[in-house]
Amino acid sequence: MLVDSHCHLEYEGLVDEQEAVLDRARGLGVRAFLNISTKQAEWAQVVGTAQKTADVYASVGIHPHHADEHSELERADLLAAAKGGKVIGIGETGLDYYYDHSDREAQKHLFRLHIDVARELQLPVIIHTRDAEDDTLAILEDEMGKGAFPALIHCFTASADFGQQVLDLGLSISISGIVTFKNARDLQEFAKAIPQDRLLVETDSPFLAPVPHRGKTCEPGFVHDTATFLADLRGESLDSLAEYTTRNFYALFSKAVP
């Protein structure tokens, strides 16, 4: 049994046939789904889906793309939302300097705000980082110095050096379908070396469909293809990888019920 640790069930391509999408995934052995929010306007819908669906959980947070739109976000609002039923994580949040859709200082401010709430509640921070390794690491190191908090780098595509540094800080790493792409050699090499107790798998659906589904809308069930590829890459059985990545999910997102 697998868990899709990061999907966007309210996004176009999935929301209109949400139940069918989930049923297809269940048929492939996916036992739980973490439905991720990216802006405050989504929180109610994301949490609502989790509340009405036994095997779906929710996160609340602001994607760095939307930082400028949330300059007035109050800590109390994020804290209250994060205390909601079936909310098991904070995010996704972080830094994206590739697109720079929002001011970098605004991104940093919200990243720290998310961490502060996560530290208080001891819920994992779900981190997006792209072309921002130095600042991401600097913030993580600084914030860890104020008190520990659980955290995950989602859809990991960064350098091996960055990966090792976040592992040294105690973070977990989630691998998406990008690892199946033929040009993802560096990611494939790093994915071989991630310790078993720090590895999770995800789809980031409806984006980033893995081989052999490239060009299609990604679905949570495609985590099976990513896990199959990853198990072969690491010289492990699919059953073994599924068992420990699922165990890792419930250990990290400890508010979820296995």
What are these regions, as identified by a protein language model?
Residues 1-258:
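Mid-domain alpha/beta scaffold segments of enzyme catalytic cores
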